[in-house]
Amino acid sequence: MKQNFFAVDLGATSGRTILGSFIEGGLNLEEINRFPNHLIEVGGHFYWDIYALYRHIIDGLKLVAHRGESIASIGIDTWGVDFVLLGKDGNLLRQPYAYRDPHTVGAPEAFFSRISRSEVYGKTGIQVMNFNSLFQLDTLRRNHDSALEAADKVLFMPDALSYMLTGKMVTEYTIASTAQLVNAHTQRLEPELLKAVGLQEENFGRFVFPGEKIGTLTEEVQKITGLGAIPVIAVAGHDTGSAVAAVPALDRNFAYLSSGTWSLMGVETDAPVITAETEALNFTNEGGVEGTIRLLKNICGMWLLERCRLNWGDTSYPELITEADSCEPFRSLINPDDDCFANPADMEQAIREYCRTTGQPVPEQRGQIVRCIFESLALRYRQVLENLRALSPRPIETLHVIGGGSRNDLLNQFTANAIGIPVVAGPSEATAIGNVMIQAMTVGEATDVAGMRQLISRSIPLKTYHPQDMAAWDAAYIHFKNCVR
């Protein structure tokens, strides 16, 4: 009998629900509903509308129920670091802050005045970024935030949504690891860091790993959706964790690039790699499935283009890619990870101003802006990959690009040109596939991650890009390193 697995995949700009099932020869995915996920700006702060996300999930479940389809289980993954605060009565105390909120500017330095940067990194192996949950929580503590002071529980976004569906509070390992609150060696919440932000382990839900059952739909949700007591399974709650589980690699000599709003480049390791070098380069060790560690670097990704598109109306990606392809190469380059691109009011203007202040031609046409973004991303990927090669316990012979960005032929070719090794693109739905596969492993439909990857490689169309024009890209890389600030 065919089993359907309901995957909820929420990104920082959009979300969707997907029904996955196994068919002869592979995996079938059907999108049930897709919806925007917008920042809400109120009083100079940025929040997520978790109630809207919950409503969209309920809508997806109702659509499946209306068709008479059965669901074997449900899994939820989201972006990282953001969280919900619950009172003693189990109710949400307010909408969660979004990680792009400016209140964490300078937060790491404030925290390190009490516990040193090296000590924090030595425990967690997580790269230092302003918006890590550790620093968000410490910012709220220092600001005497009323919601934090009243909070009984802290739930990360995927865990908060599973709580709204099941009434059960959990803390899933991969999403907690990303938060910089988990000891990378013990794979448990780190008591010293919790104490530093005024919390204890009791302020979090039951600690679970991917593949564990969270609970079943509450009677209320069953009544609203018309479904039964369907189990909700902890997948890799951090979307990158689910995505990397779906990398269609047949050996381990690969790096991955999860390409979406963020670009996350890394390798899989069997143990944390926490050294003076990884600390200096600000690489992160995030928890993965089956006990693996994702040694990776966060790179700003399609956020740059997504924000530019806000000014460009309904222009499609193919149109923009065609315009970029016809523009002069290497005219202007930026550092995608410069702070000025974190959340500017006008991304186009921020890019132009960066080029102006670094003495480069200022992009005027839309195609020039897009080409600047793509070339700069590809060259930044090369820079990060060079560091990754020095840190990886295995050689890197292929780069697997997964996620929505894997559909971008021009950027994929630029990336192959820049890094000098083959780029294998796909699947674009890696996060949803990983989500479904982890659910399927729980009920025995799939055996292990290696078997999952073989199935994906056989059943999902992939495209390989080989390096071209390497001399020109080598020269551009020198220019890139000289002009980034």
Curated annotation (Swiss-Prot):
This is Rhamnulokinase. The active site is at D239 (proton acceptor). ATP binds at A12, T13, S14, G15, R16, T261, E306, G404. Its cofactor is Mg(2+). The gene is rhaB. Transmembrane segments: none annotated. Pathway: Carbohydrate degradation; L-rhamnose degradation; glycerone phosphate from L-rhamnose: step 2/3. The keyword Disulfide bond applies. Disulfide bonds join C355-C372. GO terms for molecular function: ATP binding; glycerol kinase activity; rhamnulokinase activity. It comes from Bacteroides thetaiotaomicron (strain ATCC 29148 / DSM 2079 / JCM 5827 / CCUG 10774 / NCTC 10582 / VPI-5482 / E50). Signal peptide: none annotated. It holds the Pfam family FGGY_C. SUPFAM superfamilies: Actin-like ATPase domain. Substrate binds at G80, H238, D239, T240, N298. Keywords: ATP-binding, Disulfide bond, Kinase, Magnesium, Nucleotide-binding, Rhamnose metabolism, Transferase. It is an enzyme of class 2 (transferase).
